Amino acid sequence: MLSYQDTYYSDNEKCQNYMQDTEIHGTIDFVCGAGDVWFEGCKIVTEKRTLDGSGINIITATRTSDTPWGYIFNRCTIENNVSMFNYGRSWHTSPRCVWLNTTLLTPEKLEATRFDDEGMKISSNYFKEYHTTDAQGHDITPKTNKVTFTLRDHSQPFVAETIMTREETKQYTVKRIFGNWRPDKILKKLEKQSEKLKKQYIK
């Protein structure tokens, strides 16, 4: 998926979506919306906002309201083609966004706060990160990252720790979030069927 802003927009307060091995390109708030959405093994690419590549890119803008989990990125890779970027910012309601086991191809270009500290309509959020690595597989997750989130006018200060503990990550499983609907298992079944058809018809 390739666009500038709002490349992927989950415009449903109660949606439950699952994406795997998808490539998403954009510049600002290009993965945005509500609901519970699991991104598995996806490639996230930040494109240039300006011709000279200046400016800061923001990947997500969540507005979680009627669901408990929000956006979950697991085993995703971030390719950055700009000067600086961050994981995301709060939109409104009760934004939630978690990055698990992320690979950063240009970790030196991730903002120090890691998430945008200025929300659009609300400052409070649940923004978390766990086990982030560089392209060589080295764990580059800071031991702690407390951020003071505010609105653009610096009102509503909200201090939060954005680094998760291993114990906290245990609640994030496809089974727990989606219940009896197991999109991960459905995809595995389809992949096996596809391989079977290839062997049968492509010689």
Language-model segments: residues:
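Sequence-level preference for short, compositionally simple segments enriched
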Residues: 1-203
